[in-house]
């Protein structure tokens, strides 16, 4: 059995000393993987219910800074040797798939093939509204993004023609070190 650790990279827990200690301790304890959390923005006084808490609110301070999910993992790649490094989860419909493909491939390269791309569709409607992305399209955008990412990783130049994203003759560099970089999908709901 393998164990992964979802750690809170928010506020003071996202600072270098804490990240380094957490990464090294997890690796020494035999933990197989660590994952970061993320939100691009958390609108103040949001009304959406957090589906994983009895209170309907995210744990912790709503105003605590939540850093980019990939950059702390790149830092951990430099201070660890074997632990796998994953986003858990990156809210995929809030990003262009070419950018995500490049971030994950770069992390995989920097870590020597230890990256995991964990993605989700998102639950915080107000976050989507703040980013001007239709909340109702999040599942379809996620599915299409995963196909686009795999396409970008798989060939020298990629063409992708989807409903939301079009990519023409776009080489992606670097390619992932892993032959098939894992994509974990975290989602819940009627359409998922």
Regions found by a protein language model. Name each.
Residues 1-192:
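Active-site-adjacent structural elements that line small-molecule/cofactor binding pockets in enzymes
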């Amino acid at each position: 059995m393998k164990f992964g650790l979802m750690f809170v990279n928010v506020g003071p827990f996202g600072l270098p000393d804490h990240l380094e200690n957490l990464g090294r301790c997890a690796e020494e304890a035999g933990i197989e993987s660590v994952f970061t959390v993320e939100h691009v923005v958390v609108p103040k006084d949001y009304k959406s219910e957090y589906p994983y808490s009895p209170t309907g609110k995210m744990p912790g301070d709503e105003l605590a800074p939540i850093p980019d999910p990939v950059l702390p993992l790149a830092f951990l790649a430099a201070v660890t040797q074997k632990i796998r490094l994953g986003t858990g989860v990156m809210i995929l419909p809030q990003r262009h798939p070419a950018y995500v493909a490049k971030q994950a491939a770069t992390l995989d390269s920097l870590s020597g093939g230890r990256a995991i791309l964990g993605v989700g569709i998102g639950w915080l409607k107000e976050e989507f509204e703040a980013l001007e992305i239709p909340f109702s399209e999040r599942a379809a955008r996620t599915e299409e993004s995963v196909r686009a990412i795999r396409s970008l990783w798989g060939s020298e130049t990629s063409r992708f023609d989807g409903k939301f994203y079009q990519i023409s003759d776009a080489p992606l560099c670097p390619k992932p070190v892993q032959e098939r970089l894992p994509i974990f999908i975290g989602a819940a709901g009627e359409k998922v």
